Amino acid sequence: MERFPNIEKLSTSKESHVLKAWQGLGYYNRAINLHKTSKEIINNLDGEFPSTYTDLIKLKGIGDYTASAISSICFDEFNPVVDGNVMRFLTRYNGIKEPIDSKKTQNKVKEIGKRLIDKTNSPGDFNQAMMEFGALICTPFPDCDSCILSSKCTAYKKNIVEKLPFKLKKKKVKERFFNYIVLVDPKNKTLIEKRIKKDIWFKLNQFPLVETNFKVNNIRKVSSFNKFINSQKILIKINTFSVS
């Protein structure tokens, strides 16, 4: 916030500077999208942040969840937020047995949320309460006996709380092999490159990388470690060489 105190400052900054300031926070695509959105607002929207769901969702990096949250909490639009916590609560409360990774179920839960939020006077407060309830009460391992809604909860009455919600598809863990080459010259200087592969590290600086689909054993290794990201297992090797 000190580096980019307002949207004008952010929009005129270099993307590399934004990524540098974001360093260590993870989810670097969010920084890239934030920068692109700031330019869109300044250049095409006269510097005015959109105030409706319809306009918000057009911005880079803003999907249904974020557009619903902003439009309801900031601008009192009646758009239900459905995150993982809300999804868990509403599927249990309504006894929805369909897999939550299907679009049909997601739309069904969204429709339930819409019917509920339309009955309120404060859509922002409603959405925040729903998210808090799922995060603190209707957790993955809930204390249903202490829940004020258990007597009306379909899953609780049918003794299927632990079975809901469920996903039909299980992501297969993909293995990736990263072999970084660290070159050091007599002046203790090294070489870095900008990552051009479009993944979560897109446009970030890195040591020269050789990515393979198999484990490489015949390179001099300094250190190695594994990193689990989403459904990926990344095996990383750091290989250092002196150059003259």
Where on the chain are the PLM-derived regions?
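Intrinsically disordered, low-complexity, charged terminal extensions of DNA damage-control enzymes
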Residues: 135-244
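Catalytic cores of DNA base-excision repair glycosylases
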Residues: 1-143, 149-160
